């Protein structure tokens, strides 16, 4: 498996998490939609599934880790930033095989791709605080 396959899986997972957060649809339905309606060329599908279902099923636990490092209520964080931070927090917490620097860098790249102009700074700062606490 190439690193780019995981990068593509993360990118697709952030989109699925974002969609799930906004729609409130069933996890299985959102996953099915993304697996059938998106191009999966070069995507580590198993990793996508793990990230998406992991974030969706462990959202309360992930938010408990994230909230102490926020300077505003989590409801005021943009849905894109929430999706990215939840995904990175999942990797940092449950995927010990992923070096923390890789998880943070990938999250920053996702924030640059999908977030507002300053999203990458917010994501980097929050994840740095989360890692420093561990």
Swiss-Prot record:
**Mind listing the UniProt keywords for this protein, alphabetically?**
RNA-binding, Transcription, Transcription antitermination, Transcription regulation
Give the Gene3D superfamilies listed for this entry: NusB-like
Give the top-rank taxon of the lineage listed in the UniProt record for this protein.
Bacteria
An example of a Pfam family matching this protein is NusB
List cellular component terms (GO).
cytosol
| BP terms from Gene Ontology | DNA-templated transcription termination; transcription antitermination
GO MF terms, alphabetically ordered: RNA binding
**Stored HAMAP family:** NusB
Q: What does this protein do?
A: Involved in transcription antitermination. Required for transcription of ribosomal RNA (rRNA) genes. Binds specifically to the boxA antiterminator sequence of the ribosomal RNA (rrn) operons.
Q: Which family does it belong to?
A: Belongs to the NusB family.
Its recorded name reads Transcription antitermination protein NusB
Gene responsible for this protein: nusB
């Amino acid at each position: 498996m190439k690193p780019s396959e995981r990068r593509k899986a993360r990118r697709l997972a952030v989109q699925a998490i974002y969609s799930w957060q906004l729609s409130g649809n069933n996890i299985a339905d959102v996953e099915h939609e993304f697996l059938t309606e998106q191009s999966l060329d070069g995507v580590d599908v198993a990793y996508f599934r793990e990230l998406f279902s992991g974030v969706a099923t462990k959202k309360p636990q992930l938010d408990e880790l994230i909230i102490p490092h926020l300077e505003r209520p989590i409801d005021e964080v943009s849905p894109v930033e929430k999706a990215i931070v939840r995904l990175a927090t999942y990797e940092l917490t449950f995927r010990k095989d992923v070096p923390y620097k890789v998880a943070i860098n990938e999250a920053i790249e996702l924030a640059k791709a999908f977030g507002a102009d300053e999203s990458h700074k917010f994501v980097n700062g929050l994840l740095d605080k989360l890692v420093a606490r561990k």
